[in-house]
């Protein structure tokens, strides 16, 4: 299930970048892509919940990773919505980068992730 979770994250990040690029050009298909990205948010949460459910106990760092992961999803959504409305997104981009780095670190550090930081 870890691979499914990582795959949904990668696809969601690609869709996010494409949606931002299309939004900058004023493309008409951006709304459809945004809805598809929301579906991937649900898949990310579902696969993450499945991974968490498969564990026998919930150490504190896993709970932190869940919260930071939801923070990443929230900032992605807020960036897309505020960009569509023409509002400033600088603070949201900073939050996204910080949260993304933290969630990647926790994902690779914790036992269910890949061992880059052992």
From Swiss-Prot:
Location of this chain's protein in the cell = Cell membrane
InterPro entries the UniProt entry points to: UPF0344 (IPR010899)
Q: Does the keyword Mitochondrion apply?
A: no
User: What membrane topology does this protein have?
Assistant: Multi-pass membrane protein
Any Pfam family the entry gives: DUF1516
Q: What are the transmembrane regions?
A: 4-24, 32-52, 60-80, 96-116
Alphabetical keyword list: Cell membrane, Membrane, Transmembrane, Transmembrane helix
The record's Gene Ontology cellular component field reads: plasma membrane
Name of the protein described by the UniProt record: UPF0344 protein Aflv_2205
The record's similarity note reads: Belongs to the UPF0344 family.
């Amino acid at each position: 299930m870890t691979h499914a979770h990582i795959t949904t994250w990668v696809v969601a990040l690609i869709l996010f970048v494409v949606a931002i690029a299309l939004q900058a050009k004023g493309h008409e298909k951006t709304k459809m892509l945004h809805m598809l990205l929301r579906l991937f948010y649900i898949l990310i949460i579902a696969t993450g919940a499945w991974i968490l459910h498969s564990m026998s106990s919930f150490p504190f760092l896993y709970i932190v990773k869940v919260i930071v992961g939801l923070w990443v999803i929230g900032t992605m959504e807020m960036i897309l919505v505020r960009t569509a409305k023409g509002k400033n997104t600088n603070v949201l981009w900073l939050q996204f980068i910080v949260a993304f780095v933290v969630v990647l670190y926790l994902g690779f550090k914790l036992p269910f992730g890949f061992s880059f930081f052992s």
